[in-house]
């Protein structure tokens, strides 16, 4: 495992984050979680909307049975559309903590934004929860750069704690259309520049473009893989895919691991969210952390230069 540091989080944070959203029951989930921890993983991503709180309850049961809460970094998310209000963020957090059988989460994200709500109202609620010790560092998931900056401007003007973490999409493939309604990518140059200059940590979801860098991403399979085609099929992405395949062959690894390495090689703190369904998938993801890229390889993969 490899780790990163986030100001305000006491523990080093595993850069491969285990998503708690693809497991149906504890019998399926516990072996995945156990193996992840045994391989050095310590960061788990939860959200109130996953299975309408069912995934939180499952993970809360796991925490109660294993006693590992103090050894991990716990991410919570709440206030997903259509309940994206400051009041919902507060009430859903209490529901989440009860389900997770803990008194705080280490990292908290508003799962969506609501542009109809003045950004300061979100900051006020999160700052209060932070001061009460219910949440550690906090930020937004699927937030625009304009609103993210506005949140921090408000926090600075009013002596409040600001947003220090972000969870938007970032992948080697450009997200052509949102995977789900309200999804936002951090891939545009202005977002990337802000992340580097501000020191904001990014927790990237769909960091390998949801299968685009496997055989499922081949353009000939557009009809049967319509979800991949909808969000990722574009000529520039096909060229990125071809380059990932070529570099994977040269390095003796897989295109998926090359795509993951691209996300983790950014010049700012990145953490990749992973939602494996099987032990084999989880282990491949962790093994892929050993793949490294030079700056020139990273830029070549992203079509910024002609040679790696």
What are these regions (language model features)?
Residues 1-72, 131:
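N-terminal binding-site loop/beta-alpha segment at the start of enzyme catalytic domains
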Residues 11-16, 40-42, 68-72, 102-106, ...:
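Short, well-ordered coil/turn segments that N-cap beta-strands
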Residues 17-27, 77-87, 111, 116:
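Active-site mouth loops of central-metabolism enzymes
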Residues 24-36, 85-100, 149-153:
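Short, acidic/polar
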Residues 53-57, 115-122:
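Active-site-adjacent beta->alpha loops and helix N-cap segments on the catalytic face
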Residues 70-81, 165-170:
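A short, structured active-site edge motif that brings together acidic residues
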Residues 97-118:
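Active-site groove signature of glycoside hydrolases
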Residues 117-308:
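Beta/alpha (TIM)-barrel catalytic core signal, keyed to glycine-rich beta->alpha loops juxtaposed to Asp/Glu
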